């Protein structure tokens, strides 16, 4: 397994629309393992393939407290089941150190394939509903900051640049 580099906002590759996966082969299964390891390493709860510069419809997620229940969503489709929206505080591995509130439908239906290519569907509410919608946005080239005002988007971009500079300095210092 390998930890993959995660693209950071405002990288234009994050705006790429993901293509459906035609077959769940050994390469896809390896990517799933690598994405799960990457998500855990980055202390995230969800990761879309777009974020690791693979523009295919693949999401991994683990909402458990112990990081012991990874889930896989291949070629997912999400349908809101209610018009009611609720604000949720969101963050993103591609927009490090930025958190803000986004209104999302509170109940959705998920249709997808699992890691073995088997179709499933489920009704999601709460954190699962929020997380799957957030990750689906990535597959469509949308980031949670797109829902924010222009001012907040500018602040987010500046904060990410500062975060990445600080992280780069720390990495260089650790090598010395």
UniProtKB/Swiss-Prot annotation:
A Pfam short name: Pep_deformylase
Catalytic activity: N-terminal N-formyl-L-methionyl-[peptide] + H2O = N-terminal L-methionyl-[peptide] + formate
Active site residues according to the UniProt entry: 135
InterPro entries in the record: Peptide_deformylase, Peptide_deformylase_sf
Keyword Transmembrane listed: no
Protein name as catalogued: Peptide deformylase
Any GO MF annotation of the entry: peptide deformylase activity
Gene3D superfamilies: Peptide deformylase
Cofactor annotation: Fe(2+)
The record's free-text note on cofactor binding: Binds 1 Fe(2+) ion.
A GO biological-process term: translation
Alphabetical keyword list: Hydrolase, Iron, Metal-binding, Protein biosynthesis
Function: Removes the formyl group from the N-terminal Met of newly synthesized proteins. Requires at least a dipeptide for an efficient rate of reaction. N-terminal L-methionine is a prerequisite for activity but the enzyme has broad specificity at other positions.
Taxonomic source organism: Psychrobacter sp. (strain PRwf-1)
Similarity remark: Belongs to the polypeptide deformylase family.
Sequence positions that bind Fe cation: 92, 134, 138
Name of the top EC class for this enzyme: hydrolase
EC number: 3.5.1.88
Upper taxonomic lineage: Bacteria, Pseudomonadati, Pseudomonadota, Gammaproteobacteria, Moraxellales
């Amino acid at each position: 397994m390998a930890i993959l580099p995660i693209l950071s906002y405002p990288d234009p590759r994050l705006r790429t629309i993901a293509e459906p996966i035609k077959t769940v082969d050994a390469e896809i299964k390896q990517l799933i393992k690598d994405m799960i390891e990457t998500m855990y390493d980055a202390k995230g709860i969800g990761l879309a393939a777009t974020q690791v510069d693979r523009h295919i419809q693949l999401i991994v997620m683990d909402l458990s407290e112990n990081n012991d229940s990874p889930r896989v969503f291949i070629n997912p489709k999400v349908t809101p089941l209610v018009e009611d929206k609720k604000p949720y505080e969101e963050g993103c591995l591609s927009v490090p150190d930025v958190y803000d509130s986004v209104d999302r439908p509170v109940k959705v239906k998920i249709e997808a394939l699992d890691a073995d290519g088997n179709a499933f569907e489920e009704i999601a509410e709460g954190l699962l509903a929020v997380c799957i919608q957030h990750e689906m946005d990535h597959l469509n080239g949308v980031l949670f900051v797109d829902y924010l005002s222009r001012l907040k988007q500018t602040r987010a971009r500046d904060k990410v640049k500062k975060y990445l500079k600080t992280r780069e300095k720390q990495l260089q210092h650790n090598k010395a």
